[in-house]
């Protein structure tokens, strides 16, 4: 079997799908994208074509190493996301060729279902209580929300009090019948993260995500030493080599690799194993589409230390396209009290509605995250 063609489709709301075709008619799908930089990833995918066309898609490990090493320069969000989408599609082809789900190729199940969580509240968290009630009615017990709005490098007690009051309302309304993570989204400086975490600790959120930006990772162990709350990070780390340094330094209790950013299934399986060796959980990052979610779940199903799976159904970003819009088998993503059962179809288990993908890709707007500014006019972290 040989790879014959790579085709990319940018689709709403902010995703990109990759279709890899073979000379035997088997098709594999991947989801290579960096939100807000889809065109850059699209170009990177097609720059990889000379390493892929005419090659055997079953040689996933070799093709991954060629893509990563042959071009000399490597790493970063755009390049590793391009590799990630190709890798997902190659696993999809291999599973289809052998007639088994990808998790069987990775050694088989370690669990019978995977707990997922949904988002509430939006970019600037609002209507959180109503959002949680809707999720509870749908059977969820675990959620995530942004822990704060934009914060200055040193900010006011009022901003801290507002963030704490929001979380206190959740505990007052629901007690400990729900669990929630708080995403600082890299909006918070080291100094303000220490203040916020201390003030929030008594409310016992499940974890604090991206307490500071990944480029400030040397502060993770310092922040962890000041709290009993688990710290989570990883969505803006792109290879096992970046995760290696974070694991060695300590401080992070939950790694959150993104299967569409951090080299795909092949790389994230290694990251999960590295995390397990350090007694660290994984909870893959996935505010994306169905192929990314399926890829995450296959890693979750075979990784003992997978604890939670983010999923973007009903997420505030999904204007113009929902996670299951593009699939012909939405029943296989059915949520049962927040859990998703292992897929039974071969490959990734996602049947893509190619006609709809083609239609919506013809006039897909470019998605950009908003540019926020502080009161003094300086740019704020989103």
From Swiss-Prot:
Its cofactor is Mg(2+). GO terms for biological process: amino acid catabolic process; D-galactonate catabolic process. InterPro entries: DgoD-like, Enolase-like_C_sf, Enolase-like_N, Enolase_C-like, Galactonate_deHydtase, Mandel_Rmase/mucon_lact_enz_CS, Mandelate_racemase_C, Mandelate_racemase_N_dom. Pathway: Carbohydrate acid metabolism; D-galactonate degradation; D-glyceraldehyde 3-phosphate and pyruvate from D-galactonate: step 1/3. Its EC number is 4.2.1.6. Binds 1 Mg(2+) ion per subunit. Mg(2+) binds at residues 183, 209, 235. The keyword Nucleus does not apply. The record marks 258 as: Increases basicity of active site His. PROSITE patterns: MR_MLE_1, MR_MLE_2. GO terms for molecular function: galactonate dehydratase activity; magnesium ion binding. It is an enzyme of class 4 (lyase). Keywords: Lyase, Magnesium, Metal-binding. CDD domains: D-galactonate_dehydratase. It catalyses: D-galactonate = 2-dehydro-3-deoxy-D-galactonate + H2O. Transmembrane segments: none annotated. The record marks 310 as: Transition state stabilizer. Catalyzes the dehydration of D-galactonate to 2-keto-3-deoxy-D-galactonate. Reaction proceeds via an anti dehydration. Belongs to the mandelate racemase/muconate lactonizing enzyme family. GalD subfamily. This is D-galactonate dehydratase. It comes from Verminephrobacter eiseniae (strain EF01-2).
């Amino acid at each position: 079997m040989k790879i014959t063609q790579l085709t990319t489709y940018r689709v709403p709301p902010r995703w990109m799908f990759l279709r890899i075709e073979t000379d035997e008619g088997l098709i594999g799908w991947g989801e290579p994208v960096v939100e807000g930089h889809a065109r850059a990833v699209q170009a990177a995918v097609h720059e990889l074509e000379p390493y892929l066309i005419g090659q055997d898609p079953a040689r996933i490990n070799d093709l991954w190493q060629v893509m990563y090493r042959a071009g000399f320069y490597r790493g970063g969000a755009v390049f590793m996301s391009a590799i990630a989408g190709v890798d997902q599609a190659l696993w999809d082809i291999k599973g289809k060729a052998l007639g088994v789900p990808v998790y069987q190729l990775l050694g088989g199940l370690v669990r019978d279902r995977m707990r997922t969580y949904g988002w509430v509240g939006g970019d600037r968290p609002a209507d959180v209580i109503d959002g949680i009630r809707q999720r509870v009615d749908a059977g969820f017990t675990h959620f995530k929300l942004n822990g704060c709005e934009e914060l200055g490098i040193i900010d006011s007690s009022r901003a801290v009090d507002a963030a704490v009051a929001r979380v206190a309302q959740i505990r007052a309304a629901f007690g400990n019948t729900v669990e929630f993570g708080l995403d600082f989204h890299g909006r918070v400086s080291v100094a303000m993260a220490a203040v916020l975490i201390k003030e929030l600790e008594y409310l016992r959120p499940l974890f604090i995500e991206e307490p500071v930006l990944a480029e400030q990772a040397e502060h993770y162990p310092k922040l962890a030493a000041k709290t009993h709350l688990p710290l989570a990070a990883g969505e803006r780390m792109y290879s096992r080599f970046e995760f290696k340094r974070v694991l060695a330094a300590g401080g992070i209790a939950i790694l959150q690799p993104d299967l569409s950013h951090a080299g795909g299934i092949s790389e994230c399986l290694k990251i999960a194993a590295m995390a397990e060796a350090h007694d660290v959980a994984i909870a893959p990052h996935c505010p994306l589409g169905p192929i990314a979610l399926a890829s995450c779940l296959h890693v979750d199903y075979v990784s003992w230390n997978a604890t939670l799976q983010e999923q973007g159904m009903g997420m505030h970003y999904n204007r113009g396209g929902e996670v299951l819009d593009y699939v012909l088998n939405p029943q296989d993503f059915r949520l049962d009290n927040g859990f998703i059962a292992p897929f039974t179809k071969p490959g990734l288990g996602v049947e893509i509605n190619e006609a709809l993908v083609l239609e919506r890709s013809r006039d897909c707007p470019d998605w950009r995250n908003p540019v926020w500014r502080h009161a003094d006019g300086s740019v704020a972290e989103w």
